[in-house]
Every structure is written in structure tokens, then in C-alpha cells.
Amino acid sequence: MESRVLSSGATTISGIPRLTRPAGRTTTTTVVAVASPAKLNTNGGNLVWGRQLRPSLLNLDHSSPVSLVTKPVKRDVLKPCTATASDSAGDAAPVGFFAKYPFLVTGFFFFMWYFLNVIFNILNKKIYNYFPYPYFVSAIHLAVGVVYCLGGWAVGLPKRAPMDSNLLKLLIPVAFCHALGHVTSNVSFAAVAVSFTHTIKSLEPFFNAAASQFILGQSIPITLWLSLAPVVIGVSMASLTELSFNWLGFISAMISNISFTYRSIYSKKAMTDMDSTNLYAYISIISLLFCIPPAIILEGPQLLKHGFSDAIAKVGMTKFISDLFWVGMFYHLYNQLAINTLERVAPLTHAVGNVLKRVFVIGFSIIVFGNKISTQTAIGTSIAIAGVAVYSLIKAKIEEEKRGLKSA
């Protein structure tokens, strides 16, 4: 930087008159460096502040005889630019608390993700204990979320992103798979213990790997396949001795795994620049349209005949409506926080967090509902969760290595 300033002032130095002493004395030349204004650069790296120039280049030693320059020299000094970053900490703009401690924000996201997920699963199962209509409840989950999204758009939080016909065509398969996976998950939740459903749903990585290998034609490393072996073994052990086992709950959870696998496949084809909040809002709206018809056809007559009246007789109108509203809010918010958390952390961190979330849900559901599980079921569940953890870590590491190669 100093070399640039000196070179830009070369023409000015040549114009300064020489002061010569009488004969017999040595000649001293006054060297005055005058900095012309440097070209501003928005990256802040090429800015030269006035206080940086003065000590080294612009100060004249007034105790020296050469300070007797009769012609005044005008010195141009750069003023600090408030719009760009400063070279010193003293000129930096004030940093907010959350910007200064981002790990606290990320920790809060994880906490709320876990908390809302656990509360959703517990409240959801309590509703099914007195209102066993999973198709209707699934539609309520999405309906409450849609109302929440529409309210957010109405006040500009967030601002609604535009939707065109091309994006709509891409999102319809994603929303259909999301709706099918959501409904079948709830059918399983209503039929068997929450802990058992989540144990079956831990097989989802196996279906993802199989779909990637045989449908998308992607090569899956042998290490990933080996890491899935404990998952399959653990789920098999847990299923054989699960006290609440029935085929409806088991098959529904398996269909949910397949549905969410295809949702991932279609999501990759529907990659868009739309932010995750708006994208999830549109998926929720379309998914709700898919969930309403089966709820009316399969459960409508029973609901009108005795479903609603039985639920109100058991818990009362206020609690019944309140439970449906809050379970829908918890469902939407925990899914939204899961997406927002993924945006804040690396895939490896999110993978670990997702595994721990399933452990929390299984553990809390056993404690809250007092589900009795056999020793073999407990061991099988632990093996399955451990296998999912290993798979998630290996997959996340592979993804990070791929991104590192692309950025290089």
C-alpha cells in the first residue's frame, strides 16, 4: 500500500524546489511525500486511513533544518469511509448479541426442535388414545400449519415468494409423498406404541440408500451399506418381541419410510432458490389438499356418527379443540425448525442431532406412557439407533468431502 501511495505522489515531489546552502556546504534535498487520494475499494482491503498515512509518510520532522520550506504543501488525507469495513476493531460497527454468540442461537434451535418434537409425539398419542382417527388428525396437523403460514404471509413474516406453474408441477409429487408419509406415520402412531413406530422409522436411511442406488443410479459406498446392517438387525429384533406389535402399525411405518424416500428423490428434482420457510408453506398447502379426501371418505361417516361426540364426552369440547390446535402447531413448528436448523449447521452436525432427537422421542414416550418393553426390544432399538448414528456420520462425512472437492 505504501508503495502505491509513494508512486502516486512522484509527480508532486518533482515539483518541489530544492534549497541549496552556500558553497562549501553539502546540499540537502527536502523530500515531501504527498498522498493523492487513493481509489476507494468496497472490500476495505485497499483503504488507507489518514492516521495510517500521517506517522509514516505525511509527518515532517520540524526539528530538522529541512523544515524551512517556504512554499506550503497541501496534503490530501483519506477520511475513513463509514460505509466500508474498518481495519481496526475500534471502527467496527457494533455487533449484536446473537451475532457475537451464534452458537447460542444454534443451540436454541436444537433445543426447540427437540422440545417441540417430543411434545408433539406425546400429545399426538394422547389424542389417539381417545380419538383414534389418524386420517382426520393428519389433515388437522397440516390445516393448522397452513393457517399459520397464511397468517405469516398476511403480515409479511416472511414475505410470500411467488409461485409459478413450473414450480407447482415440481412440488406436487413432493407434496404427495409428504402427505402419504405423514398420514401413514400417524396411522402407525395410532396403532402401536410411539417408541415402536420410531424404531421402524429408523429404517428410513436403508430405503434412501436403496433408492439412490437402484432408482437414481448413484453409487453407494460399501461402508454405507455395512453401516445399515445393524439398523436392519436391530429393527428386526425389536419387532419380534414388541408387546404392542400389530401388522397395521408395522406396515404403515414401512410405507411412511418409502414415501419419505420418494419425497427426497423428488425434492432433488425440484431444487429451487426459494427459501425453506416459503417452500415448506407451499408443500403444506398442497399436502393438505391430498389429505382431505381420504379423511372424508374413510373416516367421515364414523366421525359424524359417533367420533366427535365420543371425544367430546371423554375430554370436553374445549380440551378436544385445544388439543387438535396445539398438536397441529407443534407439528408445523418442529418441522420448520428442523429445516431452519439444517440451514445453520453442517450436515454432520444435523445428522447427529437427528439421531439424538429420535433417542429423545423414544425415551420420553416410554417414560410418559409407561410402555412396557422386553429386554430384546430394548437391545434391538439400541442397536438400530446406533446403526443409524454410524450411517449418518459416514454419509455426512462423504457429503462434506464432495463439497470440499467442488469448492477446490
From Swiss-Prot:
Bilayer disposition of the protein: Multi-pass membrane protein
Transit peptide feature range: 1-82
Kindly state which keywords UniProt assigns to this record, in alphabetical order.
Answer: Chloroplast, Membrane, Plastid, Transit peptide, Transmembrane, Transmembrane helix, Transport
Q: Does Transit peptide show up as a keyword for this record?
A: yes
Looking at the UniProt entry, the stretches that span the membrane are 103-123, 136-156, 214-234, 279-298, 377-397
User: InterPro entries under this entry?
Assistant: Sugar_P_trans_dom, Tpt_PEP_transl, TPT_transporter
Mainly resides where?
plastid
Q: Which residues lie on this side of the membrane: Lumenal?
A: 124-135, 235-278, 398-408
Provide the protein's localization.
Plastid, Chloroplast membrane
Q: Which Pfam families match?
A: TPT
Entry GO MF terms: organophosphate ester transmembrane transporter activity; phosphoglycerate transmembrane transporter activity
Chloroplast intermembrane compartment segments: 83-102, 157-213, 299-376
Q: Which family does it belong to?
A: Belongs to the TPT transporter family. TPT (TC 2.A.7.9) subfamily.
Q: What biological function has been recorded for the protein in this entry?
A: Mediates the export of fixed carbons from the chloroplasts into the cytosol in the form of triose phosphates.
The subunit field of the Swiss-Prot or TrEMBL record says: Homodimer.
Tell me which PANTHER family the record gives.
Answer: SOLUTE CARRIER FAMILY 35
List the protein's name: Triose phosphate/phosphate translocator, chloroplastic
Gene, per the UniProt record: TPT
